[in-house]
Structures are given as C-alpha cells and as structure tokens.
Amino acid sequence: MSNVKSKKKIAIIISCVCAGLAVFIVVWLMICGYLWTWGPFSGMANLRFKNLQGNGEQYSVENVEELDESPLNGMNICYLGSSVTYGASSLQTSFVEYIAKRNNTTYVKEAVSGTTLVDEGINSYISRMQSLDKDAHFDVFVCQLSTNDATQNKALGEVSADGTTEFDTHTVCGAIEYIITYVTQTWNCPVVFYTNSYYQSEPYAAMVDALKEIQQKYGIGVIDLYTDEEFNDISDEQRSLYMADDIHPTKAGYLEWWTPKMEEYLYDFIGQNI
C-alpha cells in the first residue's frame, strides 16, 4: 500500500513539474514575442509598437499618395530580407509597401525576422530565395544586408577569386555572392543590396565594407544607408520619431527617411541597367 502511495506522490510531483515547466516556456515565449518579436507570439510586439508616435495613423500606407511619374511604374520587385524588410517594429509595414504605393509597383516580400544571409537552416535567406517561383518575372531583386549576421557573429569570410563558381555560404561574403549568382542565373534581373542606417557595430561595418568590394566585382547596386553621413545626420527628435530602436525603423522612419533615399537610388540604378 505504501508503495502505491509513493508512486502516486511521485506521479503528482512529476505532473506538477511538467505543468510548471510548460507554463514557464509559454510565458518565456510570450516575453520573447513582446520584447523581441521572436517566436510563436511575435505578434504581441504590435501591442507595444502601435503606441509609438512614429507608427501613427498618418503614416499608414492608405494615406500615402501615388507619385505622378515614376521610373518604377509597373515593375515587379522581389525583396529578400529579415525584420527590417518585414517591418517588425512598424506593424509589418516597411519601405516595401511605401515604394509599391508611391510608384505603382507589385512585389514579392520574402522577409522573416531574425534570419541570416549565412545559410543555416530552412529560414536562411538562401533557403527562402530558393523556394521562390523560378518562373516568376522580376524587374529587380532587392536584398537586405542583414544585421542578424553581425549580431549573431556569423563568419564574414572573404570575397572569392574571379571565376569562382562555388561559394562558402556559411560565410557572409559567400552567401552574398551565391545570392547574386543565383538571382542572375534564375531571373536575369539587376540585383540591389541595401544596408541599415548607421548604428554602432564593428561586425556590421565590416559587412558593409565587404559588400562594397563585392559590388566592384559584380556590378550590383548598393543602397548604402550606413556610411552616408548626410543621410544619418538627423536630430535626436527625428531619430526618436523614425526609429523604434537602433536597428528597426517605425512607419515614419520608412516613409519620410528611408524610402525617398532608396527610391532615388533605384531610379538611377534601374535607369542605367534596364
């Protein structure tokens, strides 16, 4: 009889521990979602972001007017990236939607928060790029120089020698070169990479330098928001309005700060390459 009672007590203890662990995991995932837009509860972050001044209704896509004339008019643009392309801190609205509305473009937005250029798993840039429709028509392919590779200390690698056809996609440089080559061979359209606006990060600065070296090799476009001193010379008041944190813009940041600069570059680059 005592053995039966002991077994019941052990079963109850195990059940309580498992239940407590399950509650802890759920609460932790909710915290991750609310604070860092990560995991199955990532949508909870919108509760926080919707109250930011820079995400006010006046900055919504619905209130943006289409430009009278645009070199991008009617184009289909593919965007590949992570949280900044996704609009993680701006209620899932980024420069993608603003460019589309202002310039009458269609688009494919392949963006997943927290993902990397370096090919490690099904959500990496490369894996998701390879899942895109190979028969689609893209007029231009725009790719984000991911801050996640810098934050996660991914290997930078080095630019390959001329004539190289196989790339080390477990490094940032190799992944970038692979993406450029794959896009060119698959969709035969111009490739443009864009950087974040400036934030303090030696690894990301090194990635920007490497990207410019790759630009010289392949003739791709690079929208360099990182080292553009004039672009980054904004007031503290503007920065508070435009950025949810050091990396992620608000709707206002995309609409008033990033989008015009990106459009300016795309107009010129596409004019020379299409």
Positions of PLM-derived features:
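Alpha-helical cap/lid subdomain in secreted, periplasmic
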Residues: K9-C16, Y125-I274
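Conserved SGNH/GDSL esterase-like catalytic core that processes O-acyl groups on lipids
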Residues: N76-C78, V84-T165
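Short, surface-exposed, polar/charged, turn-prone segments marking secondary-structure boundaries
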Residues: W38-R48, T105-V108, L117, D135-F138, ...
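A generic structural signal for short, solvent-exposed coil/turn residues
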Residues: E69, I99-K101, V183, I214
